Amino acid sequence: MSKIIGIDLGTTNSAVAVLEGGEAKIIPNPEGARTTPSVVGFKNGERQVGEVAKRAAITNPNTISSIKRHMGTNYKETIEGKDYSPQEISAIILQYLKSYAEDYLGETVDKAVITVPAYFNDAQRQATKDAGKIAGLEVERIINEPTAAALAYGMDKTETDQTILVFDLGGGTFDVSILELGDGVFEVHSTAGDNELGGDDFDKKIIDYLVAEFKKDNGIDLSQDKMALQRLKDAAEKAKKDLSGVTSTQISLPFITAGEAGPLHLEVTLTRAKFDELTHDLVERTIAPTRQALKDANLSASDIDQVILVGGSTRIPAVQETIKKELGKEPHKGVNPDEVVAMGAAIQGGVITGDVKDVVLLDVTPLSLGIETMGGVMTTLIERNTTIPTSKSQTFSTAADNQPAVDIHVLQGERPMAKDNKTLGRFQLADIPAAPRGIPQIEVSFDIDKNGIVTVRAKDLGTGKEQNIVIKSSSGLTDEEIEKMVQDAEANAEEDKKNKENAELRNNADQLVFTVDKTLKELEGKVEEEEVKKAEAARDELQEALKGEDFEAIKEKTESLNEIVQNLSVKLYEQAAAEQQAAGGAEGQEAPQNDDVVDAEFEEVNDDDKENK
């Protein structure tokens, strides 16, 4: 069975890992980094992904970041006149991760385990699966990020029973999960979180502070200047990271904008104390989900054996201090918070292929599922934190006499009223025989698979008539749309490959021109003038071709020039060999005389030595 890669598709950074020799290993990207910024840029019809796109963001307005925050919604990014869904942008990132994983492994990769925040709803999970499909990946499993982290942490600790709390504060989402580890079983007891809380929000607090300070000093609102805002964003992210290690950092942005008197510079010293003050409310927002997870698992803080930190934002000292205070124990620092999720996903891939044995993963659904019933109430069929896969059915009836159809409104959430919860989908069971209200028996069944994706079925028990719906992402992508996106992604991948090949061809041609110039100087006067002129003419033709975009012509002229230069070099070596041979023959004729002289001198030296003794 081919390898299944593990992908942590993050809000700000993504990572890919693979199981090798029973161990999960992070695959470095082409720049050598172990994580890749989840940033996509479009420039002159070309796509840039990762660090390259992030660096160019200051000058390139067609740059998209933190797209994960829009997964499962109807959000669209319009770039160069084309609309892109969050799935398509995510697919571009996944394609990039897939391509360098293939380069590393030396084989085609078409299967993956992709992680999502534990608190992602059904629409967001479905959107993630669609993104994988568009990128040319068969998503073998959608796994919760905290669960993946627990897998990576607990793989070598399966002999000991322990209860762990995974505190996952990433770039855009926050999750807390409580799991029990023992005898190779990883059982999730509860999960809670906030899909609108992450490192991006901490950055925004710094940006808002810098904008306010600059406006106070200079009367100019930098938030209206896109380029200045991107520079502020980069500076804020750097300052946040710096303040995890030092108590004060200098934010210096020269020529940030221009005023009436000329260019203006931003110079601000940000202390850790000020940063903690600015972000205090964000840190406080992590407490309620932590308490909720403990409550749902029927545990107290003292029952937790180990606290695992996941996500780059857990490096913030105030966050660590809050966890320590809330749970009464020092968090475990033996795992890399940026890498542990991808590694756990790779381990789950190994479980699927059979490379990892005796490991059972029991995950839960993060939110309750139900339908809308009379009075706009949500009737729950599956409670949150139910172990998945699972199924549940309940019988309902009609609300009016001779009601011909029943509308099924599928909901996900914890609020008592239907309107306050997330709509997953709607469908209708029609052709119900005329009968007084309360007589027809309509059975509604919910099924949740191992990926947390929901199927709902409604059946008229009287007639046996049935209707079902697989809940699709609320972005409303049809199978045809996904298929078209798959084809577009493949075409783009082919185009990207061709662009890369053309760039290499151009570079090789440039290098050849340089080499030819150097070689012709060395050959001056050593080969026939006619041969030199032939090489110069071919070189000039290649230089002319390099001015255009006809890559077939460049390839042809490169091959032609290469052949001429090789022939020149061969002639040069042949000439040199002939000269050496001629010189060697002349030496051979004089050799006997020289031998006599050397022998005579040698004899004399020995005689002298004998006399001296």
From Swiss-Prot:
GO terms for molecular function: ATP binding; ATP-dependent protein folding chaperone; unfolded protein binding. The modification Phosphothreonine is found at T173. It comes from the Bacteria. Induction: By stress conditions e.g. heat shock. The keyword Methyltransferase does not apply. Residues 577-591 have a biased composition (Low complexity). InterPro entries: ATPase_NBD, Chaperone_DnaK, Heat_shock_70_CS, HSP70_C_sf, HSP70_peptide-bd_sf, Hsp_70_fam. Belongs to the heat shock protein 70 family. Acts as a chaperone. This is Chaperone protein DnaK. It comes from Listeria monocytogenes serotype 4a (strain HCC23). The gene is dnaK.
